[in-house]
Amino acid sequence: MEKSHRVCKNCVANHYWLHMDNHGKSFIKVMITDFKNGVTIPAKFARNFGGQMSGTVKLETRNGKTYEVQVAKELNNLVLRSGWERFASAYELEKGDILVFIYSGNSHFKVWIYDPSACEKGLPCIITEQLPRVQQRSISHNNHTQLKRNAKSAKLYVDSSGHSKETSEINPANSPSWKPTERVPSSEELDEPVDLANVQKATKSFYSLPRMCNMTSAQKAEVDALEKRIKPQIPFYITVMDKASATDGLLAISKDYAVSYLLDKNETIKLCHSGRSMTWDISLDIDTDDQYALSTGWLDFIRNNHLQEGDICVFEASKNKRGVALIFHPLKQSHHPKPPGCVPSTKFPRHGVSKPNYIVSRFTTLSGQLKIKVEAKVQAIQSEIPIFVAVMRESFIRGRSRYMCFSAKYAAKYLPREKNKIMRLRLPNKSYKYKAVFKINNKVHKLGGGWGKFVDDNKIKLGDICLFQLMKNKKKLMMMVHIIRKSEFC
């Protein structure tokens, strides 16, 4: 009887794996040990699916964002390796987190993420990061109009056919890196045979210039001469360094230009200098609003090439089987002084009322009563330095190793680069200062030791909002912390 029962169970298992539709089959992984560099696909799942998965799988999270991860065979195991670290970093995976991988065919998995409490990982009243933006019209040589709508700029581009196309800017980045010893690809290598079926030949460049910031006749002539000499198959991308490009670590790129001539997914591209032997690996980032920008690596590029606000940048795009490259062509007269009436880059709308000056934590957006409360508080604080807004999550307030993370955008611009400094925390109208250790681990900036005492003493709970105001002109690193209780908006 026992033997027949065992045989029956084996039959059911074989029927499940060999004869039933594979869509919806799943496996679970608990994040333990060295999970940030890769995770192993369970052996039983790998045995039954190994032949159906290509060398690359796609991981899709609940917010719809998809990541490509390489599957490596190591010691007879299938391991999610190249690309996994980026996925783990993007969703701030922590020890004890539980991930459910649900197969949906064609080497594609939907991934549900849970925290150690077995509840789906997420923030109260939070969906995904949404960056404020302003829209403006960009120009050809003879058309100089601009329309701003919010706080960052989206632009209209004029292509070679004379049709305008709309695109958008995005925000921020992590600290970049460049590789001075890498060889710059030759023009022959970059222009080796490629499939140009979807690439239109164009004789006119894409321009992205603010209102009234016209190029000089000499600059136009230099671009025209460059086009005639190089005869690019892909239009040049021409823009001007505004304040955000020079200081915020990003350069907005036309969505239409990026999709047509560069990439339509998050990827690293090679940035070269036409007259130097350096190359830089630059991230092309696409946010949830389909806004495109060059981010990680961009700051190093502008520092190494001494670019500044007002400089004209000419980029030549090139594609081959090995990837995408942008070649930077400096103009002899590259700097563009601001003429009277030129609209500078700004974080605020043009019509007098300033947008609340704050930065929210990653993958968060504020809406409803929460947004009203936060913006009212930020307006009341009137800080010159943007306020960092964080919604309290499990890892921030519970457990022995509690810590509070700052976004890479905020940290890169406003926080020190040295780790293990003491951060002093104060409440408004209180003189007592808490001491927490400011740490930097794997490019993650966070408050560690001492943060737990601040949480306990001030009875901070899951879903509460903390607004961190960096105090200016202080000899010691200090933040004023304003607290909005969850009960005030939910």
From Swiss-Prot:
Biased segments, Polar residues type: 169-178
Keywords in alphabetical order: DNA-binding, Nucleus, Repeat, Transcription, Transcription regulation
GO molecular function, one term: DNA binding
A cellular component annotation (GO) from this entry: nucleus
Pfam family for this entry, one: B3
DNA-binding region: 24-117, 236-331, 389-487
Name of the featured protein: B3 domain-containing protein LOC_Os12g40080
Region of interest called Disordered, as start-end residue ranges on this chain: 161-191
Statement: the UniProt record of this protein carries the keyword Nucleotide-binding: no
Native organism taxonomy: Eukaryota, Viridiplantae, Streptophyta, Embryophyta, Tracheophyta
Transmembrane region(s): none
Superkingdom of the source species: Eukaryota
UniProt cross-references to CDD domains, sorted A to Z: B3_DNA
Family matches, as InterPro entries: B3_DNA-bd, DNA-bd_pseudobarrel_sf, REM16-like
Matching SUPFAM superfamilies: DNA-binding pseudobarrel domain
Subcellular locations according to the entry: Nucleus
Keyword flag Transcription: yes
